[in-house]
Curated annotation (Swiss-Prot):
<dbReference type="GO" id="GO:0003735">
    <property type="term" value="F:structural constituent of ribosome"/>
</dbReference>
<keyword id="KW-0689">Ribosomal protein</keyword>
<dbReference type="InterPro" id="IPR028364">
    <property type="entry name" value="Ribosomal_uL1/biogenesis"/>
</dbReference>
<keyword id="KW-0694">RNA-binding</keyword>
<keyword id="KW-0687">Ribonucleoprotein</keyword>
<dbReference type="InterPro" id="IPR023669">
    <property type="entry name" value="Ribosomal_uL1_arc"/>
</dbReference>
<dbReference type="GO" id="GO:0015934">
    <property type="term" value="C:large ribosomal subunit"/>
</dbReference>
<keyword id="KW-0810">Translation regulation</keyword>
<comment type="similarity">
    <text>Belongs to the universal ribosomal protein uL1 family.</text>
</comment>
<comment type="subunit">
    <text>Part of the 50S ribosomal subunit.</text>
</comment>
<dbReference type="Pfam" id="PF00687">
    <property type="entry name" value="Ribosomal_L1"/>
</dbReference>
<dbReference type="GO" id="GO:0006417">
    <property type="term" value="P:regulation of translation"/>
</dbReference>
<dbReference type="InterPro" id="IPR023673">
    <property type="entry name" value="Ribosomal_uL1_CS"/>
</dbReference>
<dbReference type="GO" id="GO:0019843">
    <property type="term" value="F:rRNA binding"/>
</dbReference>
<keyword id="KW-0820">tRNA-binding</keyword>
<comment type="function">
    <text>Protein L1 is also a translational repressor protein, it controls the translation of its operon by binding to its mRNA.</text>
</comment>
<dbReference type="GO" id="GO:0006412">
    <property type="term" value="P:translation"/>
</dbReference>
Length: 212
């Protein structure tokens, strides 16, 4: 399968005119034979891309004390203190901006109830509720894992998109990223491959090329 995917990637990139910005490479996933009005049938999962998506995910961490220091040392893009959390709960505009700026959130478990109450509607709508960080858990390991993860969410729509890399990445690396996504979908969907109507690969502004 990898060779076929790689050929599709090469075709999608070669047929896309050069742009004045770094285009992402995206998958368009089309599902069928599955009732997405039932929440239990919807896709809401994560997959680690073996070669990342061309840039590390931006990670924000709700933490205090020693955990906050460890998160900063581990490369967290932003560490949110309890005081800042309180202010975000009082300013929805800033909360929405934060939700859009960062790809993933981590939170010490002690802050989860407050986050759910004050920021839940904003983060939840975007599929960005924080990953809980239990006491004594390794925040550095969690940050490292999230750097190359993509979230796969169908919601209630049969067609959805996933960024799997950048146009300037090697075609084989992109193919391996795509293969990881397809494998994860097959494992997640109720009837596996039978629920995949089609998968297309394309650059941000380029034509779509069928993968399966």
């Amino acid at each position: 399968m990898k060779e076929n995917i790689e050929e599709a990637v090469k075709k999608a990139v070669s047929e896309a005119p050069p742009r004045g910005f770094k285009e992402s490479v995206d998958l368009a996933i089309n599902l069928h034979n599955i009732d997405l009005t039932q929440p239990g049938n919807r896709v809401d999962t994560e997959v680690i891309l073996p070669h990342g998506r061309g840039r590390p995910n931006r990670i924000a961490v709700f933490a205090a004390g020693d955990t906050a220091l460890k998160a900063k040392a581990a490369g967290a893009d932003y560490v949110i203190s309890p005081e800042e959390l309180k202010l975000l709960g009082e300013n929805r505009k800033n909360a929405r901006k934060l939700a859009d700026e960062y790809d993933f959130f981590i939170a010490e478990t002690q802050f989860m109830p407050v986050i759910g109450k004050t920021l839940g509607p904003i983060l939840g709508k975007r599929g960005k509720m924080p990953t809980p960080l239990p006491p004594n858990a390794d925040v550095a390991q969690m940050i490292s894992r999230l750097k190359n993860i993509v979230r796969i969410r169908s919601r209630d729509r049969p067609t959805f998109h996933i960024a799997v890399g950048r146009r300037d990445m090697d075609a084989r690396q992109l193919a391996e990223n795509i293969e990881s996504v397809i494998t994860k979908l097959e494992q997640t969907l109720k009837d596996g491959r039978r629920n995949l109507k089609s998968v297309y690969v394309k650059t941000t502004m380029g034509p779509a090329v069928r993968v399966i």
